[in-house]
A protein has these predicted regions:
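DNA/chromatin major-groove-contacting recognition/catalytic segments
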Residues: 35, 41, 89-95, 192-213
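Proline-centered turn/helix-capping motifs that create local helix->coil transitions or kinks
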Residues: 1-10, 73, 82, 120-125
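Conserved tyrosine-mediated DNA breakage-rejoining catalytic core shared by Y-recombinases
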Residues: 16, 32, 65-117
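Active-site/catalytic core of tyrosine-dependent DNA strand-transfer enzymes
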Residues: 31, 108-153
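Basic, Lys/Arg- and aromatic-enriched nucleic-acid-binding interface segment
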Residues: 6-66, 73-74, 110
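Exposed loop/turn and edge beta-strand positions of beta-sandwich/beta-sheet ligand-binding modules
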Residues: 22, 46, 74, 101, ...
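N-terminal core-binding DNA-recognition domain of tyrosine site-specific recombinases/integrases
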Residues: 2-8, 22, 133-137, 153-159
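C-terminal catalytic core of tyrosine-transesterase DNA break-rejoin enzymes
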Residues: 51, 55, 61-62, 145-149, ...
Length: 213
């Protein structure tokens, strides 16, 4: 399988680094995501769910805990400060897994507009109510449904987070920015998981040294 402009999937060759089993990393390219999202009715709940997951890289529990009050529409910001769990058949909203998970993410203008359109369809939507009142199993079933419908390779909900990162790396985003966006506790965690996706900079270094001769 060809990944972006690479001749082969780098995940197949990478060795285990730290705690991350990086050789099992699965993700969609932007083209695969485009194919997937095209199979979902625009402005529907499912459409917005997967748009938020792909374009922000937030975790499944963070998505399911989102409320309208978490969005700063004037600043195009999304505040991540809670997570959702289903415990003993009860919905539980709790603090995120680590202090670093509490963060603010810049979102693209088109995503903000999609959120506004969705809320507009549900007139009087309470600011503090869960935006997507579903459980994780339902989300997983919907993912499988659209994967089958569109024919894209099957991945997990969490792999959409990996897809977001892979796209950022392809666009040249630095590891520190990705670390902050994902809410990782340190840069090493980010590099252990995604470092193999970064192209080698050795040739660029050699060219720089040549120019300094």
């Amino acid at each position: 399988q060809k990944i972006y402009n690479l001749k082969e999937n780098p995940c197949k060759k990478v060795k285990k680094m730290g705690k991350s089993d990086a050789n099992k990393l699965e993700f969609w390219t932007k083209a695969e995501y485009d194919r997937f999202i095209a199979g979902i009715e625009p402005r529907s709940e499912d459409y917005l769910i997967f748009e938020i997951l792909f374009w922000t890289g937030i975790r499944e529990g963070e998505l399911l805990a989102l409320s309208l009050s978490d969005f700063d529409m004037s600043g195009n910001l999304l505040h991540i400060n809670k997570t959702y769990n289903r415990i003993r058949k009860r919905d539980v909203i709790d603090t995120p897994k680590t202090e670093n998970s509490v963060r603010t993410i810049d979102i693209p203008n088109f995503l903000k507009e999609e959120v506004q359109e969705y809320v507009k369809k549900h007139y009087g939507f309470p600011e503090d109510q869960r935006l997507f009142p579903i459980v994780a199993r339902t989300l997983q079933k919907r993912l499988k449904k659209y994967e089958a419908l569109t024919g894209v390779k099957p991945i997990r909900v969490h792999d959409i987070r990996h897809s977001h990162v892979a796209y950022l790396i392809y666009q040249g985003v630095e590891p520190l920015i990705i670390k902050e966006r994902l809410g990782h506790k340190d840069i090493q965690m980010t590099l252990n998981t995604y470092g193999h996706l970064y192209p080698s900079q050795q040739k660029k270094v050699a060219e720089m040294l040549d120019n300094k001769r």
